[in-house]
Design a protein with these regions (language model features):
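Hydrophobic alpha-helical transmembrane signal-anchor segments
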Residues: 11-35
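Alpha-helical transmembrane signal-anchor/signal-peptide segments
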Residues: 38-55
Length: 226
């Protein structure tokens, strides 16, 4: 029996490599022309996030923070796009902050695609990009205590007092929900520790796979819907 297996393995090694390339090519091309149509099932974690956002009342104020850059864009950006699309579909007001410098560029890209091109929304009335501020977790603490002291202008240089949707928004408790699109520090953990947990504002996050082990304890404590 073992001898037959060894002979089979050796015979495979003698196959003309061109046949191997043909098989690989067919394996790639056939599904493109004849899609298998396999169902896409949401995981329990994904469903929790969806339900948490879906349960928000229309015109709820949602703070979305961008904490990733080009290196993690392939992993995080689709989540950011998805959450923005879901929020705007449900007529929520979106306030965008950035704990990373690159996060502002990611946010501008996502808002241009979804808010402007897909939904045709009005800046300052339906969404606003407050932008990046240096300071890591100190920025989160500033938003918790006095957002207007930290953000006197938005990313476009417009005075916050002149932005219609900023009326009656002064601190993190004025928001109905927080979403962190995070690739690391500062990010999800800081939002939980300094904002969501102390104030009770519900929160969710989209993180890189490498952060899951760090974030899951907060999920188990129901501090994050992930």
């Amino acid at each position: 029996m073992m001898k037959n297996i060894i002979e089979l393995i050796l015979s495979i090694g003698k196959v003309d490599r061109r046949w191997i390339f043909v098989v690989i090519g067919l394996a790639v091309l056939l599904p493109l022309f004849f899609p298998l149509g396999l169902p896409i099932r949401a995981t329990n974690a994904t469903q929790l996030v969806y339900d948490a956002v879906d349960d928000l009342e229309p015109n709820s104020k949602v703070l979305v923070s961008f904490e990733y850059g080009p290196s993690t864009k392939p992993e995080i950006h689709p989540m950011a796009i998805g959450i923005l699309r879901h929020l705007f579909t449900n007529n929520q007001k979106v306030y965008v902050t950035c704990l990373w410098p690159d996060g502002q560029f990611m946010a501008e890209d996502a808002l241009t695609e979804i808010a402007e091109q897909e939904f045709g929304l009005t800046y300052g009335e339906d969404y606003v990009l407050l932008g990046f501020r240096p300071g890591n977790e100190a920025v989160v603490k500033g938003i918790v205590s006095n957002l207007r002291k930290l953000y006197t202008t938005d990313a476009r240089g417009t005075l916050v007092d002149q932005i219609p949707m900023m009326a009656n928004v002064n601190k993190v408790k004025d928001f109905d929900f927080i979403f962190s699109a995070s690739a690391g520090y500062p990010g999800t953990i800081e939002w939980v520790q300094y904002a969501a947990d102390p104030t009770g504002v519900p929160m969710s996050t989209g993180t890189t796979s490498i952060q899951v082990n760090d974030v899951m304890p907060y999920v188990q404590l129901s501090l994050i819907h992930i």
